[in-house]
Amino acid sequence: MTPHISAKKDDISKVVLMPGDPLRAKWIAEQFLDQAKLVNEVRGMFAYTGQYKSKTVTVMGHGMGIPSIGIYSYELMNFYEVETIIRIGSCGALAPQLKLKDLVIASKAWSESIYAKDMGVEIPEDKILFATSSLVELAKETAIKNKLDFHEGLVFCEDAFYQTRKDVISLAKEKNSLAVEMEAHALYANAILLKKKALTLLTVSDSLVTHEALSSELRQKSFKQMALLALEMTQKLI
């Protein structure tokens, strides 16, 4: 038990899927997990543990932004001894080749956030942190097996959703960032610090290139494909 998670240690699987929205965690549990049990609802951040194809999986929301996922992923890895966290979320396309609904495997992330530095993680000059390579390969293999197209590469992890500094977005494009999101850098920092495994999977929900955006219905449909990809990955991790 922590200040933010009330679950018993045995209630949390060694592999956790983390959407940003706790209601999506609830939806995944209801749609895909057998014998799903609510194990946390502190601050409305729902966590469910259940069975997917006879393997025990936990699905828990992480909230919005670096500080939020920083807290939840750290507590899961450090106090609940979770070995692997896969974030499943949305992103905004920065690269012209990314279309709405495309799947992005974020093998690396960069940010101007000081979170990683504050946690004592050594930051390279380019500020890029990497996902766990074995998870990146597993995600690609699983996507190919399930005939899902994907893009793999660098994402920009920003602190401000309503970003007004145009130079930051320009810099992100100059670094060949595929997309922008708000959590991957902190998740990877915690995994590096605690010697755990982490990966971020993203669905393109809007484009900063074409200024298009998915409807709520299409967001849910594309999110379903990504959630199933992550769930299929768990079969090789547990």
From Swiss-Prot:
Transmembrane segments: none
Active-site residue numbers: 206 (proton donor)
Annotated a purine D-ribonucleoside binding sites: 4, 181-183, 205-206
Catalysed conversion reaction: a purine D-ribonucleoside + phosphate = a purine nucleobase + alpha-D-ribose 1-phosphate; a purine 2'-deoxy-D-ribonucleoside + phosphate = a purine nucleobase + 2-deoxy-alpha-D-ribose 1-phosphate
Site for Important for catalytic activity, residues: 219
The keyword Transferase is assigned to this record: yes
Its EC number(s): 2.4.2.1
Disruption phenotype: Probably essential, it was not disrupted in a global transposon mutagenesis study.
Family: Belongs to the PNP/UDP phosphorylase family.
Name of the protein in question: Purine nucleoside phosphorylase DeoD-type
Source organism: Mycoplasma genitalium (strain ATCC 33530 / DSM 19775 / NCTC 10195 / G37) (Mycoplasmoides genitalium)
Gene name of the encoded protein: deoD
